[in-house]
């Protein structure tokens, strides 16, 4: 665990996060995520998953699945190196150096080819590890996502000054609209059980309006306190009306 935490580099690739998913029944055949891990003799570890569907990946590969089906081949099960239900870049191979990581990945490729799996995928790989996959002939798929990065802004106005006039005007208008709704915000670092219950209600509603069940269980959120989570609630007329989860 200590080695894993030291080399993972972010909360979502950490042992604590992945283990919490496993221990709180977020990963099973019903969800389509079956947890596995390659522990190489050189000290490198690769957490990966046997996937029975493509749900919770945030990468849409249904066209590939249909193509496999048209040619009489099974696309599932497949193997995926990713963080379940979490589309963030991170280290997919946990090891001390690129040579060790490449050796471990080669072992996983061999395992895939010798088993019944259709393919091996690595999703949202951080930039520092992409060459390892390229050197082993992985096919790279490019897409776009959006991230906000704090470029040493001194204040919010300093951030706004970096935008063009149209975007700056629109953002100020949106913030003024929120102010006029008389919504207040509450930040909580010492999260209590009731806070998690309120948060999970909002989390569940987000899925329910789309006719889906939540990917994550309520017990999962209550088990990740060592990852330094922060909850922010929006209040209106003394009632919590929305919530957001952050990690430090």
Predicted regions and their residues:
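N-acyltransferase acceptor-side catalytic subdomain
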Residues: 1-248
